[in-house]
């Protein structure tokens, strides 16, 4: 989830727009319904009776960083296209194609079914999820119990990833922007009326761009959940086994509400609050990220004051807040609050920012080139190896300052076509469409500006982004989500880290309270977002036992988190 756009996941694959949707609309649908009790009465036989044509996967669709994984399991990895209705309420209006990737069970004779993955977002392309997890499981160490169990999961389950509708290469939701975006600075550190107004106008422009694309109306969680049920039916499985991370927990919950009798083993990893609106609850990220800063990052720096010389946690906090706005923006807008293995780097970047501030104050006329030269002779930390690491991060901050990026334009979710027109890519557009279409949002622009003001006051290093709310300008009726009572007794397993910055523990606890049949494993002293497989026996053995034998842990159980970091600068 990107720092400047709370709740927005950062997918790495974006397809090409074109006539694919128009061509798909020429295909009519017919047949019989798949589930009279939980689905509207429309014909789906054409979809449920299709045969998947599994072929070798195209490496360019998986991503260059995943090609090695593709080569590691060549005989078991195949890709296919699943045909689904554009609109489940009117299936004759058109067809979409959903990309699939399967890592087949190594021992098909003892196959227990398929496990479908969703990595989150919304807007994350999940095609490679199966490849990543299939590789992790297949190559887990046989020297310990949890590794042996992960290998057994690889042997007995097909692992399936898919590109949710709106993502992938076949029918991407790409929205053409009329005009340009206004220059927008950080909503945390520039609270001027002009900047806030620019942010609101940009949010309105984003919403209007996608409302002009007819595909947007069909991008929502209910449709994706029904796509997953078609996948289950085409695979020939009586029930859906599922692992969802972050937004994937919301998707899994919606699927379960639609098809409670179809739920097999379901793991909700890093949970949203399924009792609240989707779009409204992302404001909790500000609270959770500030908590990571105050309760984990700053105390870590204090514990290593001998190597970092940053003083006490309170002294460091005050020094960071006193930084000039431009430097605070460069520091905190690229702070990772979802990967606790990067704790050391986060604290070293704080040291770099403070050292750079000292250089800028002592050399007020220095340009970026001069600052880069000054960094080479500046003592950032008393330990030589730490000083080298901090100096490198100071150079990165100087580059960020030189970029002075418009916060409304991010290179990974926007592109410029040959004529210079802006286009919003699926990483952003699917996120926006799902959040706006699913359950709408509370209040109007003035309401969210008030929330933003409150968040900045409470969380001065990370709060305020709720001033920019595209869903306020999205006049589309939200979906009707089935009641939670339909799944209250389902034996769903949840996994959560205590300090999760993207989906706070409070959200998971609210979901657990609403699901009496669910069980939750809480990983302590940890802010990793997305845990399984975690790499400890306490976590992985309990999850594997659930999928392999259906064994559930107690209602509330806990596991020790992995050590957050070693010696600073090591």
State each model region's role:
Residues 301-425:
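Alpha/beta-hydrolase-fold enzymes
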Residues 35-353, 428-570:
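Gly/Pro-rich cap/lid or specificity-loop segments adjacent to the active site
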Residues 7, 14-16, 106:
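General helical structural elements
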Residues 17-26:
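Bacterial N-terminal signal peptides
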Residues 1-11:
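N-terminal secretory signal peptides that target proteins for export/translocation
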Residues 11-12, 26, 117, 426:
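Intrinsically disordered, low-complexity serine/threonine-rich segments
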Residues 30-33:
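Bacterial signal peptide processing site
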